[in-house]
Structures are given as structure tokens and as C-alpha cells.
């Protein structure tokens, strides 16, 4: 049986189909961009790819990271002190576009995206090769509108669900977006 690549299949879905076909689990590490500095982030991304990461979740530091635990908050604080900004992270990914061949998912909050403007942020992220976005504070009610914009740039919107998320809400989320559980218990 031959699988024909669907040209509209996202980089993330394509990666998961490839892993599924090989009966493999995904290795998807998270790192905070800019910790300890933006130059080291470049080295870390390439080393993670070299060592077998299938996808990478790259955090953009934010001054009010409510959805993050203490370790990621500490890392974000260090990254901000090193001068890391959203635009520097996107420029870093743009500079690695020819070297980094695995899907990169940005983890960022909604406020920095609004600062850029939805369309502008999506355009810049797309040009930098971003495959997906996780926006933990994006209200589900805003997700549909944002999803329409983001999909025109071939970027997946990934919504998070918690073990406490009501089942009906999980169904709503899962019918329209990629979802990731926020706990090992799910």
C-alpha cells in the first residue's frame, strides 16, 4: 500500500502519520527560547534535532506566564533578562529554516500576538517555518476566529485540555483543532 502525500496535510499531522506508520512514539521536547540566550537556543534546537527529536515545542518568554509552572516561569524570566523577544525568536527560526527540518511549535501567550497583529504574527511565523502554535490563554470562543486566520498560513492551532475540562468542551475542541493533554494522566 502506498501513501500519497496530501499537499494540504500539515507538517505536524504529516509527522504523526509518519510516526504512526512506523509504530513509534513522538519525542517532543520543550525549551524556552533565550534561556540562557538566543544564540545558545539556536545550538540547542539543532542538537535536539540531531539527537532524534521529532518535533520541538519552543516557548516564547512572556512576563506574565500564568499557565506555566515555576520551572518554566524561571526560564522565561532568565530569557527576558537576556533580551529575548518574540521577534528575536521568529528571526532565529528564520535563520535556521534551511537547517531545522522538524516541525517547531511555538508556545506563546495571546497578548504578544495581539501586539504584532494576528495577520502580521502569522505571516512572520509562517515565513520562519513555524508549524504550530500553542496559546494557553486563547479563549475557546476566540479560537475559531483565530483558527481561520492561522490556517491560511498553514500553521496548526493546538489547544490544550486538562483532566478537569468538561467532556462536551473537549469534544468541541477536538472537532476543530489539534489538542494536547496537559497532564500525563490523560
Where are these regions (language model features)?
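Active-site beta->alpha loop and helix N-cap motifs at the rims of alpha/beta catalytic domains
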Residues: 76-134
